[in-house]
Amino acid sequence: MDVYGLSSPDLLRIDDLLDFSNEDIFSASSSGGSTAATSSSSFPPPQNPSFHHHHLPSSADHHSFLHDICVPSDDAAHLEWLSQFVDDSFADFPANPLGGTMTSVKTETSFPGKPRSKRSRAPAPFAGTWSPMPLESEHQQLHSAAKFKPKKEQSGGGGGGGGRHQSSSSETTEGGGMRRCTHCASEKTPQWRTGPLGPKTLCNACGVRFKSGRLVPEYRPASSPTFVLTQHSNSHRKVMELRRQKEVMRQPQQVQLHHHHHPF
């Protein structure tokens, strides 16, 4: 039978030329794998599985481990180089890297706070109104007000009637004498009122009676210098009784006068 134009005897010759000498390597690797499995099963478990301070096995441990495990020479050299590189890289770091960084942050690094802006604050609007005044200044103000007040009252006395004054105040007339009420002759009154003779001719009590139409001769304030208890009163009822008594007393006198002028 021809395969690709070649006869079977030629194919046999080509197979003879091929060399499968690597079979002993594969058999050796398989036998080495079985021995590695048995040796790994015979290893005792590690006493402390956790790594303390990043402890890594040394290069001697790697050599013994590589001798126990049958690995190709190229892979073993690569693993040995890698272990030496890791050891060198860890040797460059300090023993406690975390502690050093934390202390450096605490000692060297500082985070200053935001500086406060220095701006001028406006004074309180009601600071002046609530500030207490000294007692001497208040006393002086009251004293000065008491001095100027009577002058204002005297200057306003020439105006129209009905002006208010202090209680028990007395005024002088144009002739220089003391002002008196034309009805009860009172000199002191809180207010001078208009009467039948003009403005400021009656005291406050008589002026109120005159305004209401009840000013009669029997009426007198109790403070009037012409007040007589049997003839005057400051009560309206008492005044009406006095007027009735006067009328009763006048009737017989009028009858007698009438008989005297017209005899029978």
Swiss-Prot record:
Tissue expr = Mostly expressed in roots. Also expressed in flowers and leaves, and to a lower extent in stems.
Primary site of residence: nucleus
Q: Which UniProt keywords apply?
A: Activator, DNA-binding, Metal-binding, Nucleus, Transcription, Transcription regulation, Zinc, Zinc-finger
Region annotation Disordered: where it falls in the sequence:
29-57, 96-192
One GO term describing the cellular component: nucleus
Q: So what family is this one in?
A: Belongs to the type IV zinc-finger family. Class A subfamily.
The name on file for this protein is: GATA transcription factor 2
Q: Print the organism lineage.
A: Eukaryota, Viridiplantae, Streptophyta, Embryophyta, Tracheophyta
Q: Which gene encodes it?
A: GATA2
